[in-house]
Amino acid sequence: MSTENRDTVYIGKKPLMAYVTSTLIQLANLPKVTIKARGLSIGRAVDVAQIIARKTENAGYSIGDIKIGDIKIGSELLESQDGKTRNVSTIEIAVKRNN
């Protein structure tokens, strides 16, 4: 895995808690992790960020306060299987650890 991708969690079709766990593991070693998603996975990315921010606060999580940072939205041009170019919505959510 390249260094630039270690601070990024890409949201797909796995169970929600798999992404929450992955993000928390990365936050134990890094000050900031970016959650990225596109298309139908955007809602799941928001859910992951909210679970991390709210549940760790209530549980007294040991790596410090976790806050949601910058949120970026946009779109990408992707070519579909039928050869047409389509706009797909994207989101990037920064989750930060305060020491």
Model-derived features: where do they sit?
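Structured beta-strand/turn binding interfaces of compact recognition modules in eukaryotic regulators
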Residues: K14, R38, K96
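Charged, well-structured alpha/beta interaction segments
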Residues: A28-A49, A53-T56
